[in-house]
C-alpha cells in the first residue's frame, strides 16, 4: 500500500503536467459565414504545440516521376499519399492538419480532389483554400497541396546529472 501511494504521489504531477500541455484545437463555423463543405472557416490551436509546415506536394512518386499525367483522380491520390508520408515523417497525421492550401489547374475536376481529400481526411475539416492557377511548376502537374499541422509538443527528457 505504501509503495502504491508513493508511486501515485510521484506520478500525479507528471500526469497533470501532461494534460496541461495537450494542445486544444477548436474548429468554428461562425453563423455569419456560409456553411462550409469539407473545411472549417476558423481553426484555433492553443497550448504548447509543435507546428509542422508541409511544402506543396505534387503528383511525383518517390523516384521523381509524374503519376497520372492528364488524370486528376490519379494525381490527387498521389498528392494525398505524399502529404501522408510528409506528415508521418514529422510525427503527424491528417487528424493534426489545421490548414490546407490547394492549387489546381482545372477547377472542373474539383470532385476528384474532394474524393481524394475525403478518403484521406475523413471527418477532419481543416481551414482550407482552393485556388485555380494557370499552371504549376511543371506543365503536366494538375494539383499541388500544402498543409500546416499542429501536434502536442513532446516532453523533453533530460538525462540525470551524475
Locations of regions flagged by a protein language model:
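Short, polar/acidic, helix-capping and beta-turn segments at strand->helix junctions
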Residues: 2-5, 19-162
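Bacterial N-terminal signal peptides
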Residues: 4-16
Amino acid at each position: 500500500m505504501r509503495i502504491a501511494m508513493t508511486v501515485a504521489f510521484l506520478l500525479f504531477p507528471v500526469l497533470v503536467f501532461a494534460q496541461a500541455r495537450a494542445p486544444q484545437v477548436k474548429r468554428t463555423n461562425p453563423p455569419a459565414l456560409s456553411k462550409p463543405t469539407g473545411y472549417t472557416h476558423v481553426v484555433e490551436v492553443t497550448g504548447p504545440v509543435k507546428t509542422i509546415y508541409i511544402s506543396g506536394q505534387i503528383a511525383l512518386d518517390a523516384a521523381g516521376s509524374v503519376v497520372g499525367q492528364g488524370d486528376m483522380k490519379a494525381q490527387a491520390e498521389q498528392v494525398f499519399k505524399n502529404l501522408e508520408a510528409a506528415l508521418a515523417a514529422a510525427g503527424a497525421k491528417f487528424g493534426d492538419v489545421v490548414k490546407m492550401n490547394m492549387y489546381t489547374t482545372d477547377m472542373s475536376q474539383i470532385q476528384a480532389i474532394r474524393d481524394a481529400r475525403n478518403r484521406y481526411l475523413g471527418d477532419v475539416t481543416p481551414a482550407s483554400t482552393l485556388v485555380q492557377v494557370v499552371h504549376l511548376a511543371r506543365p503536366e502537374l494538375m494539383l499541388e497541396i500544402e498543409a500546416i499541422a499542429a501536434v502536442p509538443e513532446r516532453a523533453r527528457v533530460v538525462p540525470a546529472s551524475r
